[in-house]
Structures are given as C-alpha cells and as structure tokens.
Amino acid sequence: MPSARLDVPDDTSWVLWHFLTNRSNFMQNDLFDDALPPGDAGTPASGQAPGADAARRAAVQPAPTPPDLHALATALPAQLRMGASTWSYPGWDGLVWDGAYDASVLAKKGLQAYAQHPLLRTICIDRSFWRPLTVSQYVTYAGQTPADFRFVVKCPSVITDALVRAEDGRGREANPAFLDPALAATAFVQPTLEGLGDQLGVLVFQLSPLSWDWLTRPAELFARLQALLTSVQSQLISHPQVIVAVEVRDPELLVPAFADVLRATGATFCLGLHGKMPPIEEQLPLLRSLWPGPLVCRWNLNRRFGAYGYEDAQKAHAPFSEIRSPDPHTRTLLARTIAGITGRGQRAYVTVSNDAEGCAPRSIALLAEAVLEAAAQAPRAR
C-alpha cells in the first residue's frame, strides 16, 4: 500500500518541514530532548535512594583532577583542543563527574562540569545533525562553559544528506535542499553564530553516504559544494576564528578535485576515523595537499567493528568507563599529525567518541601523552 503524502510547496522549505516532523523522530532516544523540564534533575542513578543527595544532584560537579592530569594539559600545545562527542555518560563517574548521575541529568546539566576538565577544551554538538537547533539552545550551551571553551557543531543533515530519509534511516527520495546555501545560512550558520558567538570553533559539514548517481557526477557535486562553502565563508568574514570543515563518508571523494574545492573556499578536510572510510594514513595525503591549514578530526569508531558496527561497539564498550578496544595504530598516527600541525602554529580540533576505544576521556588522555611524545621526537620547525 503506498504511503500517503501531503501536498506541500515544491521548494526547500518543505524539506525542512518534513525533516522536523519526521526525521527528528529517527533518534528516538535523543538524550538532549527539551521535553525534560529545566527544573527537573531527572531520576537518580542506579543504586541511589530516590531522595538521596538531592542537593548534589541539582548540579553536576566535576571529578577531582589529579595533579599529573593538570600537568599533562598544561604541557600540550595551546593550539590543540580535544573533546568528546556528547557528554551524557554516567560511566565517566570519577573521570569527569564526581559521582553517579543519571544520563538525563548529565544531558541537561553536565556540560558545565565537563568543561572544567583540563583536557576537554571542546565538544562536538552531534544533536544538530539530526535537527536544526535554535539560537536559545546554543546560548544555553555557551552559558554552561567558560569563555575559552569552543564548540564543534555539525550541520543538519537536511542540508548535507542527498536523500530525504524515513524514520528507519532508509532513503525515500532525492533531497532538493541538498547543499542549499540559503537553508544552510538560516538553519545552521546564523543560529550558531548568534548563539555561540566567539565560542564557535568549527562548523562541520558531514556529507552522508552518497548514492551511485551522485558519485558518478563528481563535477556537479563539487560545484554545488563549492557554492555552499563560498556562501558560508561570506557569512564568517567577521568571525575569522571559525573553521569550516567537510567530512565525507565515501572514499571515492578523496580526490584532487575535492581538495581544489576546499582550497578555493578556505575550508579544510575533516578526518573521519571509522569503518566507512580508509584508515588515517590513507586520508592524510588529502589533508597534506591543503597545507598550511588547521586540523579537524572526528575519531568516531574503532575499525575492528566495521562500517556498520556502532551497535556492536556500544554493546562492547558500555558503560564507557574503560579502554576496551585499544587502537594504538590510529592513536600514534593521529598524535604525530597533531604534533606536526600544532608545532607549526596551526590549530587542531580533535573530538573522540567512546566507540573509538571504549572511553573518550581515557582515549583523550592517552592521545595527549602520545602528542607530547611525538612533539619531543619531531624536528623543530625553523
């Protein structure tokens, strides 16, 4: 039986309407949903009495920081910012939080404590990928962090996905708003600038996996991407601190023409470390072709789980308190890349998921140590 369709205008506005009324349900367990009243601290974590320590649960407190962790953070290059992909994980008890908190509490109130961790100087706002956020939501994020904290924000997929998708993620039809400059301005760039201000660090345009139809028309794809990035950069003239990065999910796009577009528009390539893309050493040539320039990297998933292994990784890594899938190969090469780029005065933003190795804060600490080791071994720039 064919699905019913509503008559809506044939322009990009209907795509945004469809996205907000349908695609937003794709992530049904969105921990950041605004349905939780601002004054509700959520339920206590497992093992806590319902009325215990209510005052403490009203605001999430940071875990005490060992002196060696402070020393490690101080020794890192000032140009380097590392952080996680979201922060609402009770398993970070003792690492980031001072005790056991429910995930809903951390989602609402944990960012302030997260931002006090000396190694966590940025965060990736993944939520914005699933639906556009409002200025007030970005203002709330900024208000929970110190002035020196920076945000990496993902563009809504209504702009970066070539397909309009059903709730199960399957493509239903072509997306007429794909890489639309006007929609990107109103639904992404303007709200982030207004809400985050000087704390906006990186705008990430993650292109969802493309159909073969698009992959066989790279010239048209890159022309559309260049038009989008040119428009975005025109809105950032007064915000030179903002880096624009493009992440792809198709290895076929790692070609010189892609680098030409990035170079022409002042954007950079976002290293995407997961099973859908080649290992880091096979992505670095494209990044090198853009030198000099900043580094943006999202270390999302250990390659041992394959291209579609997020669910398996979640099961293997929960509750995300320990390193369970160490990846020294990726860590070492990433550390060398960070050391080389920051050692020459360029900025580096690196966000790490729990699914990279099992626990993002521990992965970041290990990466920090590897960066210092790589910097000590690297020849000094002259």
What kind of region is each of these model predictions?
Residues 12-382:
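Residues lining hydrophobic/aromatic ligand-binding pockets adjacent to catalytic sites
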Residues 2-10:
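Extreme N-terminal basic, low-complexity initiation segments
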